[in-house]
Design a protein with these regions (language model features):
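Active-site-proximal flexible loops/turns
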Residues: 1, 45, 63, 95, ...
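Active-site neighborhood of divalent metal-dependent phosphoester bond hydrolases
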Residues: 1-44
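Active-site-proximal segments of metal-dependent phosphoesterases and phosphodiesterases across multiple
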Residues: 2-5, 10, 57-78
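Divalent metal-coordination and catalytic microenvironments
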Residues: 16, 36, 56, 85, ...
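Conserved hydrophobic "DFG−1" position in protein kinase catalytic cores
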Residues: 43-45, 130-131
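Beta-strand-turn-beta hairpins that frame and shape the catalytic cleft
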Residues: 45-53
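Histidine- and/or cysteine-centered catalytic micro-motif in compact active-site loops
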Residues: 48, 57-60, 89-90
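Conserved beta-sheet core of the metallophosphoesterase superfamily
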Residues: 67-139
Length: 139
């Protein structure tokens, strides 16, 4: 767990940690931490006739992998019966396109929606994927 905490802090979590420590009251901090500890790190959903596996980073049985690992564009499908929808890995690394505004990437049973919103590049944007029809929206 220490490794995950360190990674989280190095990836921008330190400002959240400071806010929890210095801005929130102990009661508020405990409520937030309790709430976050009850959330799943992945879940399966069915929309229309499609099934999806939604996960932050990578489909896996290992909880650390679900938060920190990065899929590769040529990975075989993770599931036979559902599409994995991931973030964490900016889509430019999946597409190899470092010159265009980041766009949702569609692979073999995998969709990456991380369009770099948290990065500093001018090409970043927030993406939303409507699961009903896979229509993409950008801000």
């Amino acid at each position: 767990m220490y490794g995950s905490r360190r990674l989280w802090q190095e990836n921008g979590g330190i400002s959240t940690y400071r806010d929890l420590l210095y801005v929130c009251s102990p009661t508020e901090r405990n409520r937030i931490i309790h709430f976050l500890s009850t959330l799943p790190d992945h879940f399966d959903v069915e929309v229309g006739d499609r099934k999806f596996h939604l996960v932050h980073a990578m489909p896996s049985d290992d909880p650390d992998d679900r938060i920190w690992r990065r899929p590769k564009p040529d990975d075989p499908p993770y599931f036979e019966d559902r599409i994995a929808v991931v973030g964490h890995t900016p889509t430019c690394y999946m597409s190899g396109d470092m010159e265009s505004p980041f766009a949702v990437w569609h692979g073999n049973g995998l969709i990456d929606i991380d369009c770099g919103c948290g990065n500093k590049t001018e090409l970043r944007r927030l993406a939303c994927l409507r699961l009903d029809d896979l229509k993409e929206f950008y801000i």
